[in-house]
Swiss-Prot record:
<comment type="subunit">
    <text>The complex is composed of two ATP-binding proteins (ArtP), two transmembrane proteins (ArtM and ArtQ) and two solute-binding proteins (ArtJ and ArtI).</text>
</comment>
<feature type="signal peptide">
    <location>
        <begin position="1"/>
        <end position="19"/>
    </location>
</feature>
<dbReference type="GO" id="GO:1903826">
    <property type="term" value="P:L-arginine transmembrane transport"/>
</dbReference>
<keyword id="KW-0574">Periplasm</keyword>
<comment type="function">
    <text>Part of the ABC transporter complex ArtPIQMJ involved in arginine transport. Binds L-arginine with high affinity.</text>
</comment>
<dbReference type="GO" id="GO:0016597">
    <property type="term" value="F:amino acid binding"/>
</dbReference>
<dbReference type="GO" id="GO:0030288">
    <property type="term" value="C:outer membrane-bounded periplasmic space"/>
</dbReference>
<keyword id="KW-0813">Transport</keyword>
<protein>
    <recommendedName>
        <fullName>ABC transporter arginine-binding protein 1</fullName>
    </recommendedName>
</protein>
<dbReference type="GO" id="GO:0097638">
    <property type="term" value="P:L-arginine import across plasma membrane"/>
</dbReference>
<dbReference type="InterPro" id="IPR001638">
    <property type="entry name" value="Solute-binding_3/MltF_N"/>
</dbReference>
<dbReference type="GO" id="GO:0015276">
    <property type="term" value="F:ligand-gated monoatomic ion channel activity"/>
</dbReference>
<dbReference type="Pfam" id="PF00497">
    <property type="entry name" value="SBP_bac_3"/>
</dbReference>
<dbReference type="GO" id="GO:0042597">
    <property type="term" value="C:periplasmic space"/>
</dbReference>
<dbReference type="GO" id="GO:0055052">
    <property type="term" value="C:ATP-binding cassette (ABC) transporter complex, substrate-binding subunit-containing"/>
</dbReference>
<comment type="similarity">
    <text>Belongs to the bacterial solute-binding protein 3 family.</text>
</comment>
<dbReference type="InterPro" id="IPR053530">
    <property type="entry name" value="ABC_transporter_arg-binding"/>
</dbReference>
Amino acid sequence: MKKLVLAALLASFTFGASAAEKINFGVSATYPPFESIGANNEIVGFDIDLAKALCKQMQAECTFTNHAFDSLIPSLKFRKYDAVISGMDITPERSKQVSFTTPYYENSAVVIAKKDTYKTFADLKGKRIGMENGTTHQKYIQDQHPEVKTVSYDSYQNAFIDLKNGRIDGVFGDTAVVNEWLKTNPQLGVATEKVTDPQYFGTGLGIAVRPDNKALLEKLNNALAAIKADGTYQKISDQWFPQ
């Protein structure tokens, strides 16, 4: 009898383990503090910890695939992963291709440059401003400030390196991200007003899924609501965005 009970328990455990849902998230790990490659060559960041908390709430297993930002939505559509969490603004244009969860982070953007050099976008006429290719920052500058010379990069990290070395005049990125750079680079400062244009920066950051994956979208939204209610979200936010 004991053997039968043990066998039944083992079978139940094996079934439960194999039945756990696996969710593969596409990320572009070049954008700290949202996502970047850590000391142990692991992907770390606010988005990563958030995704892990969501998976724990859903009793699912998380994995992450690192791709260039401008390939994330095409790769999602080709089913290379189940969802994208990568500091991605919810915009009308993107919403034509993918479905987004409710916003998980309010967003704004700003240009940083050598301290006390510029004050507004009007001061940037003819200046070389770096940004990551395929981002809403790039589209905003191209559409709204064509007088600015856009310099596209495969990652914001490379843009920031060029800014420090004087090869470009500024970098346009999310406020939370550039604030991290400013903490360790006192020679730099905010060079423009904050931008929150909903046409480009939407209603915040969201997790993208394929439009036909309504089940996953619902699970993610429910899990997001749950971790906000129980304080988990705030703990993660406080860790990565200390006041």
